[in-house]
Amino acid sequence: MNTSEHTYGLAPELFGSWNGPAIGLMDLDAFFASVEQLDHPEWRGKPVIVGGSPEKRGVVSTCSYEARVYGVRSAMSSAQAKRLCPEAIWTPGHFDRYREMSARVMAILADETPFVDRVSIDEAFFDISPGRFCDEHPIQIAQRISQRVSSLGVTCSIGLGRNKTVAKIASERDKPRGLTIVTPGTEHGFLAPLPVRAMSGIGAAAESALARVGIRTLGQLAEASDGLLSPIFGINAELVRRRAAGLEVSEVRAIDAPDDVKSVSNERTFAHDLTDPSDVKAAIQLLSESVGARLRRRGLAGRTVTLKLKYSFGEGRTIQRKLAHATDDENVFGAVACDLLASIWTEGMHIRLAGVGVSDFGPDPHGIQTDLFCAVDERGAMASDKRDLAVTLDALRERFGNDAVAFGRSTRFGGDLVDPAKFLTQHAPEDV
């Protein structure tokens, strides 16, 4: 049975024995806008939009549920949002405040279980499996987490199931203030009727490719043959199928587990070999965007840039360059990676895999970001517009996925990529 209740008046049978892992996903509801309404009581019950100015071609980072009634959505242009909801209250956002509130929420999770995996500023997985840390029923713990978060003045939605895929999808079924429980053994019935895009990692390109072979629901995806899935997902076809069937095996590490990261990298295997210089450079920049976002999320910046290529005939080449200063800006290290290309590749050679990495971490001369749309360097001067934009895009992509915003260079060959790196097992993003 799966259920979802705002008041948590849950059916007694749900509290029977829970067999196997219990993985939760806590997602803060309209987080940035909720914090703004908390800090400005006069804004409560009114449409609030957090984002760039409509007069300066800004974008919406997030908005309150009152604004969503008018059709306003994250990643929408601010100009369009203003047309849809002219009475909305606009704010550029205050990222330091959001981080402060996020830390308080994450502390609640850490108090309930040592097994917490923070996904983004407003989202985290947690493991409350019976017997792993305590013997209390997982549903009771999830209820208490929701209530404790609400006591801070913001709300969350929680999905609870036996793995991360189920928990993530469940958390999105009944927002805001939802608690959706997928009890052990009911995963197939919960997932099967849902569209394939409900599963994280399936973007527009994969959705279109699946539709062309008649696969539109997770139930159909779970039963599809290798012959249908391998051309779309390559070596990851079986992993995708298991996730769609609710059979994924998930791990949530302890908060204090070793995290001595020496490098951050991302690799992709291409569905079709790349031979055109423009396509190769676009692929390198796409990989760099992912690495840059993960560097900023961890508060890291590196001096050494690594470019890795693997050719269709099996041979691979790797080359590095050291920078004068550490950076987390993909526009900087991505350009360096593209510049390194000529040293290990000749036009016409078939590239099967490409990877970009950053290591040798040190202080970033740009300093830390103090406002969602306004970054300040160590001398108090305004940082570059590109860095400001990168931080904003990070927030959008963290919350709504990599498809939320993309540059033309990233989409020119997107349909030829094995679907997003979340599906890659042999060649996944790495923090090592």
What are these regions (language model features)?
Residues 10-17, 198, 206-351, 363, ...:
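DNA-contacting surface of Y-family translesion DNA polymerases
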Residues 61, 168-170, 252, 318-319, ...:
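Short, well-ordered secondary-structure micro-motifs
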Residues 119-123, 161-164, 300-304, 349-353:
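Short Gly/Ser/Thr- and Asp/Glu-enriched loop/turn motifs at secondary-structure junctions
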Residues 327-399:
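C-terminal hydrophobic structural anchor segments
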Residues 31, 54-57, 312-316, 361-364:
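Short, charged/polar surface micro-motifs in flexible loops or helix N-caps
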Residues 124-130, 317-321, 363, 371-377:
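Short, hydrophobic beta-strand segments
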Residues 1-242, 255, 293, 377-432:
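Gly/Gly-Pro- and Ser/Thr-rich, intrinsically disordered tail segments characteristic of DNA damage-repair
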